[in-house]
């Protein structure tokens, strides 16, 4: 008996097979990608471990302004620095005597402070590394022509540089600035009587909540001073301190000229211990 055509697609089975093969190929590709990504993560972890064959190294950083110092510490730490096969872990410390880096304005008073602490810079030309606008904070903004120095309070223990710059800018002469820094210093921003019309000398980044900031046309510029080793800072930490200073200065997009000239008498009067601490 002769066979007759059924009218069905003779390639139906081949089409289903192709679809199945495509699905299998996609699954295989996904598995390969997953395994590859796991391998990359493992490889980067292993590479990091190989870079840090010497382990971790704590880098102590002191700063005349905690906000400026912490900003630089955070930025350097986020870069995952490796120095001499150590994974460097920067942290802020209170004492210059314990530090491998000192962050402070590059002034004669700062150099005298280092000398008094028995520390010496590891480089002859330390670079500017950070800046912040300074001004006053109060219940309301104030016009500079209406701002007199007797209305300003200076939290020298927390913000020495801002206090010096604001006093110099607002007082207009060194004698009045020194007198204000001596007589109108406060222990902290909490002591400010904003409702009584007082204004706080502060960096813009440190304005207390609820107060309004008015700039006085000056920036505080901080230099990262890498320090030589001593009995508390070893050679590896000193070398890491130099890397910290290099990193900070390369990221800094301002100049030392952003900070107006302020006399040494005013800088000294803005120290927490007052001008008598520096001779």
List where the protein language model places each region.
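Extracellular/periplasmic juxtamembrane helices and adjacent flexible linkers that interface
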Residues: 2-42, 53, 81, 229-279
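Bilobed "Venus flytrap"/periplasmic-binding protein-like clamshell domains
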Residues: 67-68, 156-176
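Structural alpha-beta junctions
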Residues: 78-88, 170-181, 253
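Periplasmic-binding protein-like
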Residues: 126-135, 209-242, 269-276
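Short, well-ordered alpha-helical segments in soluble proteins
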Residues: 138-140, 144, 170-175, 248, ...
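Ligand-binding pocket segment of bilobal, Venus flytrap-like solute-binding proteins
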Residues: 167-226
């Amino acid at each position: 008996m002769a066979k007759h055509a059924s009218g069905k697609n003779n390639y139906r089975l081949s089409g289903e097979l192709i679809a199945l093969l495509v699905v299998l190929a996609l699954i295989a590709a996904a598995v390969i990608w997953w395994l590859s990504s796991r391998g990359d993560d493992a490889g980067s972890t292993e590479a990091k471990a190989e870079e840090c064959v010497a382990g971790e190294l704590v880098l102590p950083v002191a700063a005349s302004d905690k906000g400026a110092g912490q900003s630089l510490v955070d930025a350097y730490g986020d870069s995952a620095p490796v120095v001499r096969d150590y994974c460097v872990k920067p942290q802020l410390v209170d004492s210059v005597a314990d530090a491998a880096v000192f962050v402070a304005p590059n002034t004669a008073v700062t150099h005298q402070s280092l000398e008094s602490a028995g520390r010496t810079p590891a480089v002859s030309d330390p670079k500017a590394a950070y800046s912040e606008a300074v001004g006053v904070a109060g219940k309301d903004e104030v016009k500079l022509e209406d701002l007199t120095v007797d209305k300003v309070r200076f939290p020298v223990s927390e913000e020495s540089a801002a206090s010096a710059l604001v006093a110099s800018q607002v007082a207009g002469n060194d004698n009045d600035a020194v007198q204000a820094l001596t007589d109108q210093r406060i222990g902290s921003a909490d002591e400010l009587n904003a409702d009584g019309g007082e204004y706080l000398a502060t960096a813009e980044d440190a304005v207390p909540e609820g107060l309004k900031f008015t700039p006085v046309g000056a920036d505080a510029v901080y230099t990262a001073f890498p320090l030589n080793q001593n009995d508390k800072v070893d050679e590896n930490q000193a070398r890491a301190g130099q890397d910290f200073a290099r990193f900070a200065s390369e990221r800094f997009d301002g100049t030392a000229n952003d900070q107006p000239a302020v006399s040494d008498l005013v800088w000294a009067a803005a120290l927490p211990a007052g001008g008598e601490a520096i001779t």
